[in-house]
């Protein structure tokens, strides 16, 4: 699962790599989180364009967004078959700009965040799917999700999943809506080994409000502590004549 990532390099670096004509001047972002605006590159009228969409895919057929769970990742194994992804995989594939992402590794009773980036410091592209949802009053909401796959050898010790990284020489294939989805799906695979490096960073990244360069600095302190849990409240004694409530089945959810 990929739930946080970063876009920190100069806008011109991304423009040269992705080949879109617009010249956006976006600030560095060190802690991009679900529901926030994210930059994607897609095909429109035969050319590439950069666009801002919400991170969290919302299929066009959803009637009420409140009834649809937030989908930030699309498992590569199911994009050809799952109703939430099928249509986007056919016609609305995109590239998601990035130069690093975070994964959390179990460390004792806690989890230690790690920052993952290319060893050469270059930007890269997540494989993405985008959708446009239209509300009852004609309002439009464009959204996207990151396609994921099993982790490669280098990243598997941290997390079992990783984003699909599209090689630069395959950008055109992934973006072209005239390329059938099964051919495009051939790009859904773990990144080559020795491409990325990973190192521990501060747990400050856990807080979405934090967004600064210190988040990607190497952290050599002790392992992350376990999350603090509030002490359970002492239940009031029930009257002796009160019968215990019947099981309503909710325990099976946890």
Name each region found by the language model.
Residues 1-254:
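Short linear sequence motif anchored by a di-proline
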């Amino acid at each position: 699962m990929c739930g946080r990532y970063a876009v920190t390099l100069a806008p011109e670096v991304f423009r040269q790599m992705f080949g879109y004509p617009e010249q956006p001047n976006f600030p560095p972002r060190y802690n991009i989180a679900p529901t926030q605006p994210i930059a994607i590159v897609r095909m429109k009228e035969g050319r590439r364009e950069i666009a801002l969409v919400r991170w969290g895919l919302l299929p066009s057929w959803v009637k009420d967004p409140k009834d649809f769970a937030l989908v930030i990742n699309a498992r590569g194994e199911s994009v050809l078959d799952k109703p939430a992804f099928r249509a986007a995989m056919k016609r609305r594939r995109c590239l998601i700009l990035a130069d690093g992402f975070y994964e959390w590794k179990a460390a004792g009773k806690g989890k230690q965040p790690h920052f993952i980036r290319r060893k050469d410091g270059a930007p890269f592209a997540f494989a993405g799917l985008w959708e446009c949802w239209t509300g009852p009053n004609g309002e439009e909401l464009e959204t996207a999700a990151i396609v994921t796959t099993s982790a490669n050898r280098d990243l598997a010790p941290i997390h079992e999943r990783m984003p699909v990284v599209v090689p630069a020489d395959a950008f055109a294939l992934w973006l072209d809506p005239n390329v059938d989805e099964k051919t495009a799906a051939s790009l859904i695979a773990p990144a080559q080994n020795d491409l990325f490096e990973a190192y521990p960073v501060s747990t400050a990244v856990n807080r979405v409000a934090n967004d600064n360069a210190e988040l990607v600095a190497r952290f050599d302190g002790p392992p992350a502590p376990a999350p603090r849990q509030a002490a359970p409240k002492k239940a009031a004694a029930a009257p002796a004549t009160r019968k215990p409530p019947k099981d309503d089945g909710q325990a099976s959810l946890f």
